[in-house]
Amino acid sequence: MSTLTFLLMDAPYEQARTSTAFRLIDSALRRKVGVRVFAYEGAVSLAMTGQKPHANAVHGRTLEEEAHPTPHAWVAALGAMAQENGVPFDWVNCGLCVDERGANEVVPCTRRGSPADFWKMNIESANTLVIPTR
């Protein structure tokens, strides 16, 4: 089975690069391709369960009307999709980055690791896509 590795660096809500990465990961999982993600720097916050949706007072929308997405829900949905499709999904948060940001409360389909995990993921994958910050 083919496996792809993604290295993400952007924090939630900062750049369109993150949502693009989620779309690529979603597409791979739908095609039953295994996915490994190494979250580095601000990207470790993508899986934080403390994120909450909010209303949009500027546009006069309630919480329900705004339907604000939370990245941790996307990460959990990707993990669930992989499980449903019977393909590997390994989301690793850089432990040093987690400690720097206090990003300890995360969705269950993720784990703590180190840059050595990214190295191993890279070697074992058909291809690796690094989505850097600017």
List PLM regions with ranges.
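Residues at the starts of beta-strands that form the adenosine-phosphate
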Residues: 3, 30-36, 90
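Walker A/P-loop phosphate-binding motif and the immediately C-terminal alpha-helix
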Residues: 21-30
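Short, glycine-rich nucleotide/cofactor-binding loops
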Residues: 4-19, 35, 41, 46-47
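A glycine-rich helix N-cap at a beta->alpha junction
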Residues: 55-93
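RNase H catalytic domain
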Residues: 45-55
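N-terminal glycine-rich phosphate/adenylate-binding segment common to multiple enzyme folds
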Residues: 89-134
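Anion (oxyanion) recognition and catalysis
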Residues: 29-30, 83-85, 122-123
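Short, hinge-like loop/turn segments at secondary-structure boundaries
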Residues: 53-57, 109-111
